[in-house]
Amino acid sequence: MTAKTPLHTTHLACGAKMVDFHGWDMPLHYGSQLNEHHAVRNDAGMFDVSHMTIVDILGAGGRQFLRKLLTNDVDQITHNGKALYSCMCNEHGGIIDDLIVYQRASDNYRVVLNSATRQNDVAWIRAKSEGFAVGLQERRELSMLAVQGPNAIAKTLSILAPAHVDAVSTLTSFECVDVDHWFFARTGYTGEDGLEIIVPNEFVTQLWNDLLNAGVTPCGLGARDTLRLEAGMLLYGQDMDETTTPLESGLAWTVKWEPEDRGFIGMGALASQKQQGIKRKMVGLTLLDKGIMRHGQKVIIEGCPDGIITSGSYSPTLQQSIALARVPVETGEQVLVDIRGKLIPAKVGKPRFIKQGKPV
């Protein structure tokens, strides 16, 4: 039986086409994935992301624990209300999950994890927390909305209480604030400006309806996927997993090597890989002919082992097919993609196609 978010009946009332997403009954779209995509790029859209896993790490040992758990270093967070993106790796350097950690207070950190990896992630974090002065609290009583797009913040501010407006209007990128049991973060998964809002379950339907009345477009998983792909944002379980490392996934920037005595989990394995040199890298592909690149398709590189498409789709913004691919480091400027037995040329570039709504 699939799980349902508190907004399930609201989605149905909005005309959503529902699909099973890792055990959750979630909206794929509300009639037009294309219109939803463009709404986020040009105006404002909202996503129910209440299926995500929210874990609060409480106690005086929170920072010390997270410095051991994550590849990125939370010591970069210099004050309360800051957020940090990181990978969480196993001892072999394989990515268990990617996540955002928010410092709400010196003894209070919030981690938002992927839903598909919830059970494994929570068990891993709990096991690794032994010996640290921390307690873990999974917050299933909370719901989460992502409001994204160039007009997302303005439209959100128009429906908030004055106390919320005062706090939210001063947020900059990767900052967060708590107000009256509501949590606001200027983060997202679309490549656009916006907010992720976490509220008690009993408030989320009213929040959704208020945003709807303010002209924010409901958006489903389909648009969320094409938006994040255009922005070069990876999807766990598809673009990376425990068999891949941050260094070969375009996420080397999330690995902080100094100070050496931090000894985060997987540091030794990643240091060895760095010293030896990676054999594979993540690139962006733009198809040069008709066709759609999809996950799992082969990438043919002359004189090299095959690469593979990890994520691919049609880009509504660029109006052509784009993809993320893991390929040998020797890969040049052009490759061939095997699409249903036909070899179609594709241009190789950076694994990001759109920045703030504009082609990179």
Curated annotation (Swiss-Prot):
GO terms for cellular component: cytosol; glycine cleavage complex. It catalyses: N(6)-[(R)-S(8)-aminomethyldihydrolipoyl]-L-lysyl-[protein] + (6S)-5,6,7,8-tetrahydrofolate = N(6)-[(R)-dihydrolipoyl]-L-lysyl-[protein] + (6R)-5,10-methylene-5,6,7,8-tetrahydrofolate + NH4(+). It comes from the Bacteria. Its EC number is 2.1.2.10. GO terms for molecular function: aminomethyltransferase activity; transaminase activity. GO terms for biological process: glycine decarboxylation via glycine cleavage system. The keyword Transferase applies. Keywords: Aminotransferase, Transferase. The keyword Methyltransferase does not apply. Belongs to the GcvT family. The glycine cleavage system catalyzes the degradation of glycine. The glycine cleavage system is composed of four proteins: P, T, L and H. This is Aminomethyltransferase. It comes from Legionella pneumophila (strain Paris).
